[in-house]
Regions:
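Membrane-embedded alpha-helical bundles of multi-pass enzymes
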Residues: 2-231, 431, 439-440, 480, ...
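Soluble catalytic domains of enzymes that build or remodel membrane lipids, polysaccharides, and related
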Residues: 228-510
Length: 544
């Protein structure tokens, strides 16, 4: 369908459609965590995400060429991803010293580059479904290409799946499918709904008999999984018999002082808090102690070790570590040290977790990007990654699994620890410092990411952060306790670990990763392609 204001044939979309897509993409970014003050502040808005994607689906469905389809997806996704990650500008400009125009350009290039995946997905959708495909199969194909684009964005070049559309449904009716299919499955469901509603109701192939049977099974499966979702079940029978009293520390050390003038303050404040707390389990933020042990003042670390080894408490402390390789070279890691009672007085080894999923430009420099790093004044290091699914800390009957910073963005990696139900974590802990991004919506977005992991995996998540959001999340993904952001404080509460019960998502992802989703999406695209081909060539249609 052409518009009268399509004056330039070299431009694949009307200006009105482009503006509408930009607005819809921006609205989708808002749906992930409402950035404005008020009752909705920080909350997800699933309804807004659905409306935004319906706009994309409607325009995409009316595309006249693959070029139009590509640019529809690319423009929408560029606006959405800029709106989701604009706060990267703060780290590059304020803390990295990159001039404002260059920092803004870098954010725009990142977002528009990642949006290429979605543009390509929309072009594939057009090629497969331009004719001879029913609404049901059309919506299924759109869900398939969208989830494939989300997975590709979340895995290639180390992956950056921040802002995936599924996060907008933490508080919508779709949340109950998260323990079955995870955030990527919610992405597919939201895309399916959007195309089913937004597709132009012009002449389409009616749903075949096979398709009607398939639709009945689909509705039945969705109803069953929704009704039996672990998120709707009572976890009392699986929770620990006795609560664990925890204290989560929030230092609120300004990022521009953290590795300079703020070092002495951090050493003093965290040492005092760790030694004075009466809780069973105390957690500091990521790199709360911003020095490797060899750089610490004399008699700083030893009193901490002695305090926890002789008492009945445990602590997780975030700090960088330096170890010498067999070749004598120093290797650095972003780590967590666990201090706890030592049953064997001769034992001196502490629990250690090394961050596995490192941040590009923060903890390692990607190939060919040294020139970009040299333009910024950020203390970067080449860190060594730890392994996936490292052992949990064992304390008072709980298996406590830490993750650092944006590692909780990769649910498929956290799920690897659930492969053996007898060794699966009963509690998860996230240690973060996102002060790099200021007191912005990034704090609420990251909190919602942790909420999704708790919901997917059916385990409480404890969050200890430098500036926020320090919080306790139950196994249903609900925030039960939270400190205000950008203040110094300690959050103390009682939590119960969850034992035995493993969510369906944790079961299949821990064994097969995301491949079942990829395979199912490709199967749908194959079916849609075969159906469209048969319809165009006058053959009997065998798809739905």
């Amino acid at each position: 369908m052409r518009d009268s204001n399509h004056a330039d044939k070299t431009w694949p979309l009307t200006w009105s459609a482009a503006v509408l897509l930009l607005g819809a993409g921006a609205a989708q970014a808002l749906s992930l965590a409402w950035p404005f003050d008020g009752d909705w502040s920080g909350a997800t808005q699933g309804w807004l995400q659905c409306l935004s994607m319906i706009v994309l689906a409607g325009i995409l469905d009316r595309s006249q060429s693959r070029q139009q389809a590509f640019f529809s997806g690319w423009i929408f996704s560029s606006a959405w991803l800029v709106g989701s990650t604009w706060w990267l500008f703060i780290s590059m400009n304020k803390y990295g010293g990159l001039p404002a125009p260059m920092a803004a350009l870098a954010v725009g290039l990142l977002a528009s580059g990642l949006a290429l995946f979605y543009g390509a997905a929309c072009a594939v959708f057009y090629a497969v479904c331009k004719t001879g495909v029913s609404i049901l199969l059309r919506a299924s194909a759109f869900a398939a290409v969208w989830v494939l684009a989300e997975i590709v964005r979340g895995t290639v070049f180390t992956g950056f799946p921040w802002g995936a559309v599924g996060y907008a449904h933490l508080d919508s009716v779709l949340q109950h499918w998260a323990p079955w299919v995870g955030v990527y499955g919610l992405c597919a469901l939201s895309a399916f709904i959007a195309m089913a509603i937004g597709a132009e109701k012009r002449e389409r192939k009616s749903i075949s008999g096979v398709g009607k049977v398939g639709l009945v099974f689909l509705v039945a499966a969705l109803a069953y999984t929704w009704a039996t979702s672990p998120s709707r079940a009572d976890n009392d029978e699986h929770r620990s018999k006795h609560p664990l009293r925890v204290t989560l520390l929030q230092g609120n050390i300004p990022q521009d002082l953290k590795f300079g003038e703020g070092v002495n303050r951090a050493l003093r404040d965290y040492s005092e808090a760790l030694l004075s707390s009466t809780s069973d389990f105390i957690v500091t933020p990521e790199t709360a102690i911003p020095l490797i042990q060899q750089q610490m003042p004399d008699r700083y670390w030893q009193p901490l070790e002695a305090h926890f080894s002789k008492g009945s408490q445990a602590a997780m402390i975030g700090l960088p570590l330096a170890m010498r390789s067999e070749q004598g070279q120093l290797k650095y890691s972003n780590s967590v040290i666990g201090l706890m009672p030592q049953t064997n007085p001769a034992a001196s080894a502490n629990y250690q977790y090394d961050k596995h999923h490192l941040v590009p430009f923060g903890e390692f420099v990607p190939p060919l990007f040294q020139w970009f790093v040299r333009m910024m004044n950020i203390p970067l290091g080449e860190f060594t990654p730890g392994s996936v699914a490292q052992p949990s800390l064992m304390f008072k009957g709980e298996r406590i699994a830490p993750n650092i910073c944006y590692e909780d963005l990769f649910g498929e990696e956290l799920a690897r620890s659930f492969a053996d139900p007898n060794k699966a974590p009963t509690l998860m802990v996230n240690l973060s410092n996102i002060a790099w991004f200021g007191n912005t919506v990034a704090i609420d977005q990251h909190l919602n990411i942790s909420r999704m992991r708790a919901l997917e995996l059916g385990r409480p998540m404890l969050r200890a952060t430098n500036t926020g959001a320090t919080a306790i999340i139950n196994a249903r993904g609900e925030v039960t306790h939270r400190l205000p952001s950008a203040v110094q404080g300690a959050l103390t509460a009682e939590v119960y670990g969850i034992h035995g019960s493993i969510t369906p998502y944790a079961q299949w992802v821990s064994r097969f990763g995301l491949w079942p989703l990829v395979g199912f999406a490709l199967l749908i695209l194959l079916l849609a392609s075969a159906t469209a081909y048969a319809s165009r060539h006058g053959q009997r249609r065998f798809g739905p």
